[in-house]
From Swiss-Prot:
Binding partners and assembly: Homodimer.
Family (UniProt): Belongs to the heat shock protein 90 family.
GO molecular function: ATP binding; ATP hydrolysis activity; ATP-dependent protein folding chaperone; unfolded protein binding
Originating species: Francisella philomiragia subsp. philomiragia (strain ATCC 25017 / CCUG 19701 / FSC 153 / O#319-036)
Region listing for B, in residue ranges: 338-554
PROSITE patterns: HSP90
Gene: htpG
Protein name from the UniProt record: Chaperone protein HtpG
Superkingdom per UniProt: Bacteria
Region of interest: C: 555-628
């Protein structure tokens, strides 16, 4: 039959131009789209042949084949799927917005749709061929049609398309791309195979290419025998009982490119209003560029086993260490598949998998403390970001936190907040903590002295994230969380009546000298008072309850962030009334020595806190002046 010419439907020429030049930024996608369509056609035949076995035409070895011809400058993708009639060819390939598979899906009702493994909601995927080809030829025959009733479709995307009736022995569709001159590098076995592995490795149907061997000179020799080039089964769609630990670990290494085994995995199938499968992994070790929050991270998104995109933020940033896949047909995709539309379905999936991960981490922490400790050592700091970033899950995340304390014995972060609460002293209703640059600086901080003497455990927070985290985490299990370097510390309930009376007497005795010290240091401190924190050291500095700690001020300065008015607050100087240096100051009559000692007590307290000393040389001279 002679060929018939058609023009594309309204505005299709413009849309084709958009697809070719703007819609897809990555040329590689063309192969993903064609393989996806072939898989779609095979899945449709697989479904329809259940009720009409004759459609298989005694051929149930479903396969997708990719061939290339360097001389002809062509790439051909073929399948033995359902195929198309001439009418379907004109409708589906002549109109951007229509998809035969989408119409097919809409015609299904009830539970049958659950058995149908289709992915055809994209409408324009076929036209991505024109990114790399200046002409496309389609040969197709509908399953069940006579061999002489096949259809040939040809277009250059510029002048409409032609259709003619041809003879085709085998059912299914064959798409031949006539490759553009500037895309001829695609005519390579290894490149095409790598694209299959990257985008379509988990297609349920075998994807085949002719075997390639090399002669003694290294020249490629293409054999007539086909081999399957997609390697990975969609294990996330299988029952957990059907997957071995070895298979789980092999798949993890494939998707993560990690040499080590995963620490744990979470395999989950969700059914109901929202249906999806997920297979999530937590690595053993963090990658070298882990702290780059701008780096792509997250899960590989599949729709019915077809890879859509990688590193899509289906996870909150504080779970960016999680690897794995999400596979769902409920996700809406825009016309290019490149950008997920932000809607309620996506939000629900993100919320659900976040909850699942936190729940599984909680189980791990209770069942296998050694393995959880390994997780915490690798990813604890980034998990802390969630306390501030994810208000709805703040309590769950708080329960997963681990810290060193004054009772834990070393810098290893092993103590949970629940552990701390379980061993609080009788009458204690506050969780005490201190933030510092390092474990040694924290555990030796003078402000711990009274707590150590009274046997009150204090959490030692030494990660840079801790200051920001604690601005949000103000209580746990109904217990207020209190920084011991801020505001007043009320330990009166743990004091004897004699000590309380003694402190009140000292406060009266020092009332005059405290005012004099404050006058000397008036430009440098907010206040001067006697300390309930100190037992051995002469002085320390604190800020008020709502002030920015000296540790935080230091970190902000190091980060190059200046202070708004009122943010960089003056410290409060606290003195130990029983220390001999403070007693000497109290009794000092020489105004110069009095001023020097006042300055020295402030500077050494600032130094211990790691605060910035504006004039280090002046500090050294002052110390040297009084060394005897």
């Amino acid at each position: 039959m002679s060929e018939k010419k058609y023009t594309f439907e309204t505005e299709v020429d413009k849309l084709l131009h958009l697809v070719i030049h703007s819609l897809y930024s990555n040329r590689e996608i063309f192969l993903r789209e064609l393989v996806s369509n072939s898989s779609d056609a095979i899945e449709k035949l697989r479904y329809e042949s259940i009720s009409n076995a004759a459609l298989n035409e005694d051929d149930t070895d479903y396969a997708i084949r990719i061939d290339f011809d360097k001389d002809a400058k062509t790439i051909t993708v073929s399948d033995n799927g359902i195929g198309m009639t001439e009418e379907e060819v004109i409708e589906n390939l002549g109109t951007i917005a229509k998809s035969g598979t989408k119409k097919f899906l809409e015609s299904l009702t009830g539970d049958k749709s659950k058995d149908n493994e289709l992915i055809g909601q994209f409408g324009v995927g076929f036209y991505s061929s024109f990114i790399v080809a200046d002409k496309v030829t389609v040969r197709t025959r509908k399953a069940g049609q006579d061999k002489s009733q096949a259809t040939k479709w040809v277009s250059d995307a510029q002048n409409g398309f032609t259709v003619e009736t041809i003879t085709k022995e085998k059912r299914g569709t064959e798409i031949t791309l006539h490759i553009k001159e500037d895309q001829l590098d695609l005519l390579d076995y290894h490149l095409l195979k790598s694209l299959v592995n990257k985008y379509s490795d988990c297609i349920n149907t075998p994807i085949q290419m002719k075997k390639v061997e090399h002669d003694k000179d290294g020249k490629q020799i293409i054999k007539d025998e086909y081999e399957t080039v997609n390697n990975t089964k969609a294990i996330w769609l299988r029952s957990k009982d059907e997957v071995t630990d070895e298979e789980y670990q092999e798949f993890y290494k494939y998707i993560s490119h990690d040499f080590a085994d995963a620490l744990m995995w979470i395999h989950n199938k969700v059914e109901g209003n929202l249906e999806y499968n997920s297979l999530l992994y937590i690595p053993q070790n963090k990658p070298f560029d882990f702290w780059n929050r701008d780096k792509d991270y997250g899960l590989s998104l599949y729709v019915r086993r077809v890879f859509i995109m990688e590193n899509k933020e289906l996870l909150p940033p504080y779970l960016r260490f999680v690897k794995g896949v999400i596979d769902s047909a409920d996700l809406p995709l825009n016309v290019s598949r490149e950008i997920l539309q932000h809607n309620k379905v996506i939000d629900k999936i993100k919320k659900a998998i976040t909850t699942k991960i936190l729940s599984e981490l909680k189980k791990l922490a209770s069942k296998d403390t050694e393995k959880y400790q390994k997780f915490w050592d690798s990813f604890g700091q980034v998990l802390k970001e969630g306390v501030s970033d994810d208000y709805s899950n703040k309590e769950k995340i708080a329960g997963l936190l681990r810290f060193a304390t004054t009772e834990s014995g070393d810098a290893k972060q092993t103590v949970s907040l629940a552990d701390y609460v379980s061993r609080m002293k009788e009458g204690q209703d506050t969780i005490y903590y201190i933030t510092s640059d390092s474990y040694k600086a924290a555990v030796n901080n003078p402000q711990l002295e009274a707590f150590k003497k009274k046997g009150i455990e204090v959490i030692l927070m030494t990660d840079r994230i801790d200051e920001w985290m604690m601005s949000t985490l103000t209580e746990f299990d109904g217990k207020h969380m209190k920084s011991i370097i801020k505001g007043d510390i009320d330990l009166d309930k743990f004091e004897t009546p004699e000590n309380k009376e003694k402190f009140e007497k000292e406060a009266k005795d020092f009332e005059k000298v405290l005012k004099e010290i404050k006058e000397v240091l008036k430009d440098k401190v907010e206040d001067v008072r006697l300390s309930k924190r100190l037992t051995d050291s002469p002085s320390c500095v604190v800020v008020n309850d709502y002030g920015m700690s000296l540790h935080m001020q230091k970190m902000m300065e190091e980060a190059g962030q200046g202070f708004m008015p009122g943010m960089g607050m003056k410290p409060i100087l606290e003195l130990n009334a029983e220390h001999n240096l403070v007693q000497k100051l109290k009794n000092e009559a020489d105004t110069e020595i009095f001023a020097d000692l006042s300055e020295l007590l402030l500077l050494q307290a600032m130094f211990v806190e790691g605060a910035k000393i504006e004039d280090p040389m002046a500090f050294v001279k002052l110390v040297n002046k009084y060394i005897r």
